[in-house]
Amino acid sequence: MVSRREFIIKKNKTIISVLVAFLIVVIGVFKFSFSSGYKISIENKTDKTIANLELKYKNGNTIKTISQIEPKKSLEYNIDTNSIQGENAIILTYKDNKGISYEESVVGYLEKGYSGKSNVFINEIDNNGNFGIEIK
């Protein structure tokens, strides 16, 4: 026959085991559902096709080469920040009609595991191929 004390101990062990299992599941869901990374959105609000853009880290490593964005269209990229070593930033580069390179800071400061969102709006392109860019 099981005494009352043994019954309470078994009941407490069962409750603790269920709570531990629940916590493990909750931690797993949060870890995989809210993974770190930056979402970069680039929207071409002009009437011209934009070509040859690059998203790069400040240290020079290319993240994504964008061959073109059609007029009134947008693209989104998810950048995994878990592989970043040390401090960094995300830069958008392009060239004007004369081949002169320009850089726009998309994310000013970044470290491993950071997350967030940055919206890049290309509102105009002048006759020289320079962009009027707004970043939010």
Annotate each predicted stretch with a short phrase.
Residues 33-39:
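Short coil/turn motif common to extracellular beta-sandwich-like domains
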Residues 1-12:
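N-terminal Lys/Arg-rich, disordered targeting/topogenic segments
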Residues 84-135:
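Structured, soluble extracytoplasmic/luminal domains of envelope-associated proteins
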Residues 48-57:
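Short, ordered, surface-exposed loop/turn motifs in non-cytosolic proteins
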Residues 56-105:
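Extracytoplasmic/periplasmic/luminal assembly and interaction segments
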Residues 40-49:
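Asparagine-centered strand-capping/turn motif at beta-strand->loop junctions
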Residues 13-31:
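Hydrophobic membrane-insertion alpha-helices, especially the h-region
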